[in-house]
Curated annotation (Swiss-Prot):
Known role: Transaldolase is important for the balance of metabolites in the pentose-phosphate pathway.
Alphabetical GO biological process terms: carbohydrate metabolic process; pentose-phosphate shunt
Known pathway: Carbohydrate degradation; pentose phosphate pathway; D-glyceraldehyde 3-phosphate and beta-D-fructose 6-phosphate from D-ribose 5-phosphate and D-xylulose 5-phosphate (non-oxidative stage): step 2/3
MF terms in GO: aldehyde-lyase activity; transaldolase activity
Keyword Transferase attributed: yes
Any Gene Ontology CC annotation: cytoplasm
Protein name: Probable transaldolase
Signal peptide coordinates: none
Residues annotated as catalytic: 83
EC number: 2.2.1.2
Keyword annotations: Cytoplasm, Pentose shunt, Schiff base, Transferase
Length: 231
């Protein structure tokens, strides 16, 4: 499973990219608005940090303007995935951009039927929102299972399931178990994946035991084993 971070905070992106665990970035108008930065400049900087797909969303809702914005965003860098809403206009733009060789992320997916439409429109990614479905009393992960099952039945569908609106580590692990291709999550959720009380407890014990030895690994010379190797 690929891990994307859902943020427009450049400092957070740099920090997580340094771990070597980050495969891409997703942004949306709300996240960008919080930064107060010019959108195109910000996306360009993110693309300099992350070599994987960087989703940049159009702001318009009509097909003509969305297409113009999508083409403009696609010129920023080869790894830009233009993000469009799952509407008739959005899917029309998706098909055109896909035919032109641009990656497209179709967002705001809330049903398996919508996911089928996104795949038929040539989307590189479809983004079903699990957390928002949970919020209205549905089980968002059930949608992931449906989409993965349908896509698996049709090898011609090359669209990747990009699980969005992730709220906790369980959303991540269950999405992986179901076979989703990508999980995009806020930085806080990525950091929660590292955490386990037994890891902390075990590390504290190892550190305490090592300190009792009074040793320093870096002060110890590597033994000369050249003679042994020849033997």
């Amino acid at each position: 499973m690929k891990f994307f971070v859902d943020t427009a905070d450049l400092a957070e992106i740099r920090d997580l990219a340094a771990t070597g665990l980050l495969d891409g970035v997703t942004t949306n108008p709300s996240l960008v608005a919080r930064t107060g930065r010019p959108f195109v400049d910000l996306v360009a900087e993110i693309c300099d940090v992350v070599s994987g797909p960087v989703s940049a969303e159009v702001a318009a809702t009509d097909a003509e303007t969305m297409l113009k914005e999508g083409r403009h965003l696609a010129r920023i860098a080869p790894n830009v995935a233009v993000k469009v809403p799952l509407t008739p206009a959005g899917l029309k733009v998706c098909r055109t951009l896909a035919n032109e060789g641009t990656m497209v992320n179709v967002t705001l997916c809330f049903s398996a039927a919508q996911a089928i439409l996104a795949a038929k429109a040539g989307a590189a990614f479809v983004s079903p929102f699990v957390g928002r479905l949970d919020d209205i009393g549905q089980t968002g992960l059930n949608l992931i299972a449906e989409i993965v099952e349908i896509y698996d039945r049709y090898p011609a569908f090359t669209t990747e399931v990009l699980v969005a609106s992730i709220r906790n580590p369980t959303h991540v692990t269950e999405s992986a178990r179901l076979g989703a291709h990508v999980a995009t999550m806020p930085p806080a959720v990525i950091r929660q994946l590292f955490a386990h009380p037994l890891t902390d407890k075990g590390l504290s014990q190892f550190v305490a035991d090592w300190q009792k030895t009074g040793q320093n690994i870096l002060e110890q010379a590597i033994p000369d084993r050249s003679g042994q190797d020849r033997a």
